Amino acid sequence: KNAKLFVNSPNALEGNKTENTANAAFQSSEAGMVDVVAQEDELLESIRTLVSILPANNEDDMSYSECTDDLNRACTDLEASAADPALSLPMISDDNFFFEVKKDYAKDMVTGFIRLNGNTIGAIANRTALYDEEGKEAETFDGTLSAEGAEKAAEFVNFCDAFSIPVLTLTNVTGYKATKCQEKRIAKAAAKLIYAFHDMTAPKVNVIVGAANGTASLAMNNSADMTYAWPQATIGMMDPVSAAKIMYADEIAKADDKNALISEKAAAYAKLQASAESAAKRGYVDSIIAPETTRQIAAAAFEMLFTKREDRPAKKHGTV
């Protein structure tokens, strides 16, 4: 926590009078350069944990361990905790193990490692709420994909693929964050995330736990080997309310009770076009699963994909 990291010394930065850009807090939460911030004893323990779960290389199998947890264990509280993946991912993992990386940076996107059937799995999830140690809501997010979140996830995907670590995603995204600052970076950041997932040769499993709306959903592991959805998930080009307002603009303008008509049309659109059932009928998802069976289904999917091999044509590298 007392370490310093910088390219230019804080007092050498033009216009900077007060902010210490070299301390661990800044490099962790603002720059995204630091994976873990802790005191020395905690940091050493984190390193030991990482060494024990990460393979030595992309062909190493020494990171696998015997699973003592029930693979069919029901995650009864998973749906209630879905807003904060820092709570829901441990429920899916063997013995509630979860090692989060870059937890202070781009908090709308959660990245870390879990264990399934004794195997190390990279986990990526959208966050809409952050809860403190007392279980109280400390911070909320709007469900959109930010440039920082996309970059954070893309770097994590590349790391996992370098070691052939499978990746599980819990998708809940409504669109891209819409601000002038984000507009400068979001296109390139989203492209990097989409490319990272498509370029990945290790097993990929996607579980849509909430919304998968618009082109932002394409960035969240759209190229997964197996895709599942919870029954209440909404999957489509836009959220049902926005779609209803566009499609029935003339009717809404003439209606006496506009809100009632919007709700009616949105519900009809959601059932016909944006429900998990309609997505399954179109082949967008492989199966609709109950939230409490997520651990069981994910473990089975990764077991099936364990021997996945993907041959690539001889070339140098992509340009994204």
Indicate residue ranges for each PLM-predicted region.
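Ligand-binding clefts of soluble mixed alpha/beta catalytic domains
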Residues: 1-320
